[in-house]
Amino acid sequence: MTNTNNEYVLIAGSISKNTEKLYIDRAHSFVRALTKSILDANVGLVVYLAGEPVNENGALLTFDWTIVKEAVDLMENYTPAHQLKIVTSRSAMREKMSEENRMLIRKLQVARFADVSYLDDDLITGGNIGSEQVDAATAMIALGGGKGVSDRASKMRKANHPILPFDLELGGICDDGKGALGLHAHFYAEPLSMFPCTGEAVKNQLDTLSLQEPYYGLERLSEIAVELLKAEWAAQQLLHTPSVLILTALPVELAAAKKVFGIADDESPRLTSNGIHFWSTSIQRSDGPVTGIVASFASAGNVNASAITTMLLSEFKPQKVLMMGIAAGLREKMVLGEVIISERVIYYESAAALEGGKFAPRPEILCLHMPTKQNLNTYLATTSLSARLGERAQAIGLEMPVNSQAGDVAAGIIVSSATIASGELLIRDPALLERFRSLHDKACVAEMEAYGVFDACEKQGVPALIVRGISDFGDSTKDDAFHSIASVAAAIITADYLQHGWIRA
């Protein structure tokens, strides 16, 4: 559930004095519906209060007083929690407001439904008013208006706050720019500048959210608007402090991670400051959700893995890192589709070059942090593990083949701990795979990224685990047949471990 206690919406805009009554009435009715939907969602509103500009027929040309009067009518339905942030000035209170309107503000203050912020009378400019509103708001909805709306939107974009413009043709009180209509057109061109996390998804809905030619009733349209803002806030909250970084190297591994972690195949990635693609996910647990970031190295190799892991650690500062994917296994020890979790990683490339062209192995060995080792031991000892993994495999649609020409196949999803030999070689020689056991007699899995990930995490004090599905035996039978199966199996174990194995500090 999205925490909305500190979220505030600015409904920015105005109406031209020449706008038809039909559209003026629709705009104010929509703002009243929005006010209710926003308050229902435990979200607040930001307003600027001064006079009440009207056209020759007495129709109000701004929305702030509409919001306040609706809030006064509704406030008995809510627990007072300063849901309104009112920006005004002493001179505006004194010279531009009626006594009746001043009493409305007092009523909201006494009920603890509003906080009032007073601008210095000598500093009242459109820019300063806008800055004060934007400082208080975490989202903006735009209707009509001109340069003032555009200026507020520019400030909101710099703060990475969502902006939802509507297409109702209202003009603006100053007739000095395109306002919400310009923002609406901009949304189609650059959706992520308007909703930084969910912009592409919102863009796909924008045509159905027309206020000029409404498909939905105004109440439902206001509810959808708030739902979109809440989805964006939720996505941004996930990014602030993700619990776990989930890493892959190859496209087949990334596809498996997205499938198991519930990321739609057509969901557009976000970009880090270094241009690395990533997706947000959440794993539900009894002690609260685990927030995660899924990313990929986009190629194999420990050097690349170390560099990208370091960049992602610096950007997201996760509590834990899991790398998942495929690996080669020793035929005598492993079966196809089996999943292993690293208990240690050996970097087999390190050596001394001796006289006569001889090499003396000097392997680097990295082991699990003690808390991680304890978590893994407890996880593997759980009696319900096998049944739970079977249920997960069935739910995701993973079926192990009965047999394979390449060798023995796992009867189902099985997992154990193992020692990984990591280097820069794509293994197609079983004798070489066997020789890794001379470095450590428990080394029975070979791959190309684990040491890079472990080393990067070790340097920053972040615990890491490697989860690998066995896709081949590192010999002449090696092909791509088990890549997808082994990747999905590894992803299932990764998700299950995060839900049931990792004990948060």
Curated annotation (Swiss-Prot):
Domain notes per entry: Has 2 domains, an N-terminal domain probably involved in sensing cyclic nucleotides and C-terminal purine nucleoside phosphorylase (PNP) domain; the PNP domain has ATP nucleosidase activity. Expression of the C-terminal domain alone stops bacterial growth without cell lysis in E.coli.
Disulfide bonds: none
GO biological process: defense response to virus; L-methionine salvage from S-adenosylmethionine; nucleoside metabolic process
Entry keywords, A to Z: Antiviral defense, Hydrolase
InterPro entries tied to this protein: Cap17-like_N, Nucleoside_phosphorylase_d, Nucleoside_phosphorylase_sf
Protein's recorded name: ATP nucleosidase Cap17
Enzyme Commission numbers on file: 3.5.99.-
Organism: Escherichia coli (strain KTE188)
Region (Cyclic oligonucleotide sensing-domain): 1-229
Family that this chain belongs to: Belongs to the Cap17 family.
Catalysed reaction equations from the record: ATP + H2O = D-ribose 5-triphosphate + adenine; dATP + H2O = 2-deoxyribose 5-triphosphate + adenine
GO MF annotations, alphabetized: adenosylhomocysteine nucleosidase activity; methylthioadenosine nucleosidase activity
UniProt xrefs under Gene3D superfamilies: Nucleoside phosphorylase domain
Region listing for Purine nucleoside phosphorylase domain, in residue ranges: 239-505
Pfam families per the UniProt record, alphabetical: Cap17-like_N, PNP_UDP_1
Function of the protein: Effector protein with (d)ATP degrading activity of a CBASS antivirus system. CBASS (cyclic oligonucleotide-based antiphage signaling system) provides immunity against bacteriophage. A CD-NTase protein synthesizes cyclic nucleotides in response to infection; these serve as specific second messenger signals. The signals activate a diverse range of effectors, leading to bacterial cell death and thus abortive phage infection. A type III CBASS system.
One Gene Ontology CC term in the entry: cytosol
